[in-house]
């Protein structure tokens, strides 16, 4: 029997639609501890007003710290130690550009992780891998790939920077996008686009998620094992949406909702009434009471960060 057939009263509160995110795998962000991040931040140019402008500024800044060399740095993966070596005349390769750029981005609250790119035949070729950074850009609501060694991004036809996953898909579709270094550093060479694009045959997060929809070879030339914290059989988890929101229900003198985000630098949520346009800011873990005047309540909820509010999610409930 349904509610009407049982002649029951209507519920006081009824949720019709709420923000709901899928669980994500660990992001494996490339971060220093709080002291290390403060030391890195003190070296960096002042952040721009947007996350994209800040990321592009840091891409150029890191690329211009030193000229590329095949020399390797054998210390801890620490941007401050690498930059100290550079100040003393050191020059390094793509691994070190990637470490410094990834840690610099996290120091200014832009989520960033290291990716490793592999060309076809990496199991038998010594020159078949390349290290890059991938960053979540709040104002774009997506991940983008930043190549510190080349001071470059890859861009769609409308100028939007592309992510590692998007570039892997483009590679397998034979669709090479624009290799762009106009806004960045001194190491960029557009003539090398085809060569660098060849490294998108396989993409993994450094010591994190690896994915494939076919067979997988976990060993490079020379027998080096490609470590991963999780090996997935599809790319569905490769680019988690950090604007997504999940919802829990709590009792705060009546029913209330608490919103949650996987964005590591979120500072709260903005709740907007779609009818009155009124807005309310909620701190992290602060509850939104569902009490109020009877009626149809249609709201949006968005994650807020130091750079902007992210893509809003719908919330619809009825109070009686």
Language-model segments: what does each one mean?
Residues 288-297:
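Surface-exposed, short loops/turns at beta-strand junctions within beta-sandwich domains
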Residues 49, 54, 60, 99-178:
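Hydrophobic/aromatic-rich core segments of domains that either
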Residues 276-284:
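Short beta-strand segments within Ig-like beta-sandwich modules, predominantly Fibronectin type-III
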Residues 2-93, 99:
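Secondary-structure boundary elements
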Residues 211-258, 262, 320:
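Short, compositionally biased P/S/T/A/G/V-rich stretches that sit at domain boundaries
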Residues 306-320:
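Edge beta-strands of extracellular beta-sandwich domains
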Residues 301-305:
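Conserved structural position at the C-terminal beta-strand
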Residues 72, 81, 137-226:
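Active-site rim recognition segments
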């Amino acid at each position: 029997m349904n509610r009407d057939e049982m002649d029951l009263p209507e519920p006081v509160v009824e949720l019709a639609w709420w923000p709901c995110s899928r669980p994500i795998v660990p992001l494996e962000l490339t971060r220093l501890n709080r002291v290390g991040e403060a030391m890195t931040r003190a070296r960096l140019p002042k952040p721009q007003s947007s996350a994209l402008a800040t990321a592009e500024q840091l891409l150029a800044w890191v690329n211009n710290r030193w000229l590329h060399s095949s020399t390797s740095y054998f210390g801890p993966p620490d941007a401050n130690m690498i930059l100290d070596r550079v100040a003393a005349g050191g020059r390094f390769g793509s691994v070190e550009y990637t470490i410094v750029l990834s840690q610099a981005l996290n120091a200014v609250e832009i989520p960033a992780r290291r990716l490793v790119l592999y060309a076809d035949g990496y199991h038998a070729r010594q020159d078949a891998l390349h290290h890059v950074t991938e960053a979540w850009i709040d104002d774009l609501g997506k991940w983008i790939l930043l190549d510190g060694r080349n001071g470059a991004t890859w861009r769609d036809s409308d100028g939007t920077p592309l992510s590692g996953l998007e570039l892997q898909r483009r590679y397998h579709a034979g669709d090479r996008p624009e290799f762009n270094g106009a806004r960045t550093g001194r190491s960029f060479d557009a003539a090398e686009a085809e060569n660098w694009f060849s490294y998108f045959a396989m993409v993994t997060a450094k010591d994190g998620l690896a994915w494939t929809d076919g067979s997988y070879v976990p060993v490079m030339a020379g027998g080096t094992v490609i470590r991963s914290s999780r090996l997935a059989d599809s790319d569905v988890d490769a680019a988690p949406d950090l604007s997504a929101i999940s919802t829990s229900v709590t009792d705060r003198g009546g029913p209330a909702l608490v919103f949650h985000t996987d964005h590591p630098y979120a500072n709260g949520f903005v709740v907007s009434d779609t009818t009155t346009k009124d807005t309310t800011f909620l701190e992290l873990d602060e509850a939104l009471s569902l009490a109020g005047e009877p009626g149809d309540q249609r709201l949006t909820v968005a994650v807020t960060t130091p750079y902007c509010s992210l893509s809003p999610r719908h919330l619809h409930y009825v109070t009686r």
